[in-house]
Amino acid sequence: MSDKIQSRESKTTKPTKTEKISDKSGNLSQVKSSKNLSKSQSIYLEIDSLSKKFLEEGRQYIYKWIRDEYGLSKNEATALDISIYNTTIARMINIYKFDETLAAFLPFKFGKEIISPRQDFYGFATTCGTILYYQSFGDTLGYYNGNWEFNYGNDNRPDYVNDLISEFIHLGGINDISMVNWLASDDTILYLITARVVLEYFFQGDNAEISYFGTRLRQEYLKAKPLIQNRHPGQTTMDSLDIMSNIEWDKLPYNSRAIGAGAAMRSGSIGIFYPGRQNRKKLVALAVECSRITHNSATAILGSVTSALFTAFSLEKISVNLWPHYLLEILRSNIIDEYIEQSRPNEYSLFSRDKVIFQGQWEKYVSSRFSGVNPRDLRYMHNPVERYRYLTENFSKGCDMPGGCGDDCVIMAYDSLLQSNGVLEKVVVYSILHPGDSDTVGSVALSWFGAYYSTKKNLDILSPRFDELEYSNEINNLIWNTEDFVLGLTKVFYKFIYIDIATDLVEQSMKLK
């Protein structure tokens, strides 16, 4: 797997003079620095230069949008831009605080003198990096070497939840469980491969063709087939890869029966690199194609979009209560439909027909679980057995295993996050300790949990488990031991996150006038 998680091989040489390289295509610029600098110092100089570049691009985007959207004069737009800039920076510092006790999770072991001037960025980068650990933890625990995913061959009766909780406690519970020699399932392997391809695509620049992404996904998924075949992959995944070996990346036929969660489990990393409203269409396109490689159905595609979208919502710090409401807004809009119709017009009528099932599931969920935008306090949902019964009886009909479909998987994962209220043990119990597709629901829920609730307390509990993960070294190599991940996040933070926050502030400001 290590060959699949390595960084781009092409790195810049480092002449003695420090210089900034501009790139009008939207690719990441790089700063070339002295050979005498340590790796940490060299990366810091690159981050410093890139942060200024992308912050300026973000400001220019907002300034132009102000002029175009509101018809302000140059002087009015300039004055508003200055005000919005100062408020946005203050808000970014406040939202993405960095706790110095988390320094062990930083890339390249940066010292305090490097962290201090950009604590908000390093707080954001730390959160993004740990998402991959949380995902693999959820998968590995839920898989339990194939035991819990298939419940030792037992049936899916709700009261079996209590047996799993008892076994989890016997294994040590959240504080003392040991996962040494526990295997990851196909979920971790495909999630990491997808993250690496997303990062490659991100470095191609703003105008990169979607075909690059699809071609690389096809290549890497096919390479991974021998790795995943003994880790209980979904039958649809394996059958589709067999077909994909003989066709192009975008030629898998639409299949209304391919409704599994195989895409939802691996697409979350798209949301790490494409948060913000200005990136919604890009996120949708990537998530759709991520699914179509193996699961070309409306249910699977929309599960993939939801997984990526909720990761983005996490990093945008949108209240968890609002996620399903915003999801329904997007489902009712034309964003997804337009891409489906434009990219594969011959399949649009089938997609449109099946889309109502996925949308209906979420409408039913919101209607029963929410009063307005606030979740209802339903006492039976505090009981793990009754909670599982409610979710499976209402949202898992037609699935071979509860949590194994593209729609019920993300509903179960989201409800686990909602019900947890930031408590690690709760999200583990609700998302993993049930007789359904525990590794997939667990991996999706824990990845969102890590993006939204990656606190010192939770990291103190889980960091020993992170070291025990089968793919711990591969995760570490992807996010910290190469420059690409952290340098890519400079654009995400200083351009995409800046634009997203600034847009909200501008809209609020203009409403007051």
Curated annotation (Swiss-Prot):
UniProtKB keywords: Hydrolase
GO molecular function: hydrolase activity
Documented EC number(s): 3.2.2.-
InterPro entries: ADP-ribosylglycohydrolase (IPR050792), Ribosyl_crysJ1 (IPR005502), Ribosyl_crysJ1_sf (IPR036705)
Record's keyword annotation contains Hydrolase: yes
Bias kind Basic and acidic residues: ranges: 1-23
Pfam families reported in the protein's UniProt record: ADP_ribosyl_GH
Domain of life (superkingdom): Viruses
Family statement drawn from the similarity comment of this UniProt entry: Belongs to the ADP-ribosylglycohydrolase family.
Name assigned to this protein: Putative ADP-ribosyl glycohydrolase L444
